[in-house]
Amino acid sequence: MKETLSGVVTRVTGASYIVETGDGLKVRCRTVPGTVSENEGSNLVAVGDRVEFRPKASETDMAEGVITRVEERRTALVRRREVRRNRSKEKEQVIVANIDQLVLITSFDDPPFNSRLVDRYLVFAESEKLPLLIVVNKIDLDEEGMVEEDLEVYRQLDCNICLVSAEDGRGIEELRELLRDRVSAFSGHSGVGKSTLINLLVGCEELRTAETSGKTGKGVHTTTSSAMFQLPGGGYVIDTPGIREFNLAGITRENLRFYYTEFLRYMPECTFSSCSHTVEPGCAVIAAVESGSIARERYESYLALLDSLAE
């Protein structure tokens, strides 16, 4: 029997997986019906997964192998998909695994800063106990510092924020330090400059880039598969496909309130322990919004997200 080796999945393209070993060997692998996984209820393999594989004869210049085991994931970035034939059932799609932090790439303009998207990612990061770094690109377009108005509410929440410009290089070194010696998953809508930033950080043109659609104002997707890249000086970044609608797996109408962290200090003062903070009398959260202790835009974001969640 051939020797079993271990490595980390650095790229997923369809049913093909690139696994990199500790000594830098890259092996193109596939799974088989007997592949063992420590993770149930989701796709078998994702970028960032630690796996065991068995080398096999290759007819190409690249080594090939068969994945025999997928180790248990310590963290995962999940997108939830509904099963078409029975919409009451859901299947988790793990986009990346075993990350140290989630990095949300936004932009000041083209497309404009989207606070509702930021709030969705904050909820997800809080639910998964993952640090979230908010990166605002294209600050070269913000000559008057207008983005600070959008960011003030997040600074009050002690969010990690980094302002950068892929165009003139501002903030890139600061961002590099925030990524050093960590496995960071880059996510966000297409068109914000995610691929351009990764190319700058990695030091070569690894990824295609695209402009924002003039018709919709939304990004044109250029990332179609996840991939992990090593950073000079330490650390890894994982590029993930643009997510137009980020689905919050595991978040319900009943538990959403616990992930708006500014609500927590007021919740014990509500008249009803199951208060949804919408219409109930004696709601301390609503009172805090009225007094200005909780930002109204965050509360309105909560209501909108609550309404979007299934009953």
UniProtKB/Swiss-Prot annotation:
GO biological process: ribosomal small subunit biogenesis
Cofactor binding notes: Binds 1 zinc ion per subunit.
UniProt xrefs under Gene3D superfamilies: Nucleic acid-binding proteins, P-loop containing nucleotide triphosphate hydrolases, Probable gtpase engc, domain 3
Residues that coordinate or bind Zn(2+): 270, 275, 277, 283
Residues binding GTP, per UniProt: 137-140, 188-196
Coiled coil: none
Molecular function via GO: GTP binding; GTPase activity; metal ion binding; rRNA binding
This protein's UniProt keywords: Cytoplasm, GTP-binding, Hydrolase, Metal-binding, Nucleotide-binding, Ribosome biogenesis, RNA-binding, rRNA-binding, Zinc
InterPro entries with a match to the protein in the record: G_CP_dom (IPR030378), NA-bd_OB-fold (IPR012340), P-loop_NTPase (IPR027417), Ribosome_biogen_GTPase_RsgA (IPR004881), RsgA_GTPase_dom (IPR010914)
Transmembrane portions of the chain: none
Location(s), subcellular: Cytoplasm
SUPFAM superfamilies in the record: P-loop containing nucleoside triphosphate hydrolases (SSF52540)
Top-level taxon of origin: Bacteria
Family according to the record: Belongs to the TRAFAC class YlqF/YawG GTPase family. RsgA subfamily.
Function description: One of several proteins that assist in the late maturation steps of the functional core of the 30S ribosomal subunit. Helps release RbfA from mature subunits. May play a role in the assembly of ribosomal proteins into the subunit. Circularly permuted GTPase that catalyzes slow GTP hydrolysis, GTPase activity is stimulated by the 30S ribosomal subunit.
PANTHER family (alphabetical): SMALL RIBOSOMAL SUBUNIT BIOGENESIS GTPASE RSGA (PTHR32120), SMALL RIBOSOMAL SUBUNIT BIOGENESIS GTPASE RSGA 1, MITOCHONDRIAL-RELATED (PTHR32120:SF11)
HAMAP family: GTPase_RsgA
UniProt protein name: Small ribosomal subunit biogenesis GTPase RsgA
